[in-house]
Structures are given as structure tokens and as C-alpha cells.
């Protein structure tokens, strides 16, 4: 692997000029660079399938800086599938939960229902608060059947992220953060998006944030 500073310059250059070449990506610090630059250049839609927003990666710079900047903008969307809830109380997931709660809307609803009373009906007033959840951030735990579907298509131990419709990072060895990516491959992104959306829209996938 090349010098980390040279690698960062190369990744920034590829992002700026939207090069479609494949970028090798392996090891935690290199993964943090590529993910950080992808968040930096994302225009508003990020799809993430990961183990569970592991803080050892997400909190590594520049990943953490760009991740925070992206999700703090309410115009940006982040949809995520996670295998595990092991890190739900760590910084990345706590921040996602906090932002979602802040953006959710509470509406006070008044309902009138008729209740049978004696020979007639009585009008009864009921008041309640309804929380309308924010939809710019949604994190689901993937259902095992959907995880098997992805493994059947792409192999075991893979995760991937797609930014907008043309940028992606495909991780084929999650334990060692070995991956590759590109800033301009819409055809490959289309297949990954179709796979992600199929799993994400599975009613059995549980919303956790």
C-alpha cells in the first residue's frame, strides 16, 4: 500500500474529477480515508451496509469528521443496515439516535369518539401525543434471510456503501477492512442499490434508529 498521505491526495483527486477507476482500499486508516472522502463528496443519499458502525473505524479521522458533517445536515439522508447492535451505545450510533430524535416531530392530537352510555351515546374527548419519526436517518438490523441473500449474491463477510448513484466502497474482507471503491461507476452502484433496497425494505428488517 502506498504512503498514507499520497493515498489521501490520490483519493481526493479521484473524487474531485469523478474518475471511474477502481481504488484499492485495505486496512483501517485507509478505509477511514476513503469513507471520509466519500461522505465529503456525497450530495445527499448514503446507503450503508455494515457490521454495526464500529467506532474503531467510524471514529477514525477523517471518517468521523466527514460523517458528522454529513449527518448533521438535515437535507442529507442516511439509510443503514447493520448486522449487529453491539455498538448501539457507542458514539456513532448514539449521534445518529440523537439527531433522529431531535428531528422527529411530536403532534398533539385530539380525537372525539362516541361511547355507548345507557340508551344513548356520549361523545368522549381523547388527547394524545403522536411522534412522527424523522426519515432522513433510518438504521435497521438486517434480517438473517436478507443477509443470506446478500451473501449468496456477493459472498460471505462482505459489506458495502453507496453514495448517491455513482460512488461506492465494496468491502470483501470485513475483519481486515479490505475493500475497493470508485467515485464514478453508476452501473456497479445500480446493482448494489437494488440489493440494498431489497434488504432494507424487507418488513422483517427491524428499525433500531
Regions found by a protein language model. Give the residues of each.
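PLD/PLD-like phosphodiesterase catalytic module centered on the HKD motif
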Residues: 1-47, 51-209
Amino acid at each position: 500500500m502506498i504512503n498514507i498521505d499520497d493515498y489521501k491526495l490520490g483519493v481526493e483527486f479521484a473524487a474531485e474529477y469523478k474518475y471511474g477507476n477502481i481504488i484499492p482500499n485495505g486496512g483501517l486508516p485507509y478505509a477511514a480515508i476513503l469513507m471520509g472522502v466519500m461522505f465529503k463528496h456525497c450530495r445527499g443519499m448514503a446507503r450503508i451496509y455494515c457490521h454495526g458502525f464500529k467506532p474503531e473505524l467510524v471514529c477514525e479521522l477523517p471518517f468521523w469528521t466527514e460523517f458528522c458533517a454529513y449527518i448533521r445536515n438535515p437535507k442529507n439522508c442516511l439509510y443503514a443496515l447493520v448486522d449487529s447492535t453491539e455498538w448501539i451505545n457507542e458514539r456513532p450510533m448514539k449521534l445518529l439516535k440523537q439527531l433522529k430524535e431531535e428531528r422527529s416531530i411530536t403532534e398533539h392530537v385530539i380525537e372525539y369518539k362516541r361511547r355507548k352510555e345507557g340508551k344513548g351515546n356520549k361523545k368522549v374527548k381523547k388527547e394524545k401525543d403522536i411522534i412522527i419519526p424523522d426519515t432522513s436517518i433510518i438504521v435497521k438490523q438486517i434480517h438473517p434471510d436478507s443477509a443470506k441473500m446478500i451473501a449468496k449474491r456477493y459472498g460471505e463477510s462482505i459489506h458495502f456503501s453507496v453514495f448517491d448513484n455513482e460512488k461506492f466502497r465494496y468491502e470483501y474482507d470485513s475483519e481486515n477492512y479490505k475493500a475497493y471503491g470508485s467515485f464514478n461507476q453508476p452501473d456497479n452502484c445500480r446493482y448494489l442499490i437494488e440489493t440494498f433496497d431489497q434488504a432494507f425494505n424487507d418488513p422483517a428488517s427491524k428499525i433500531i434508529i
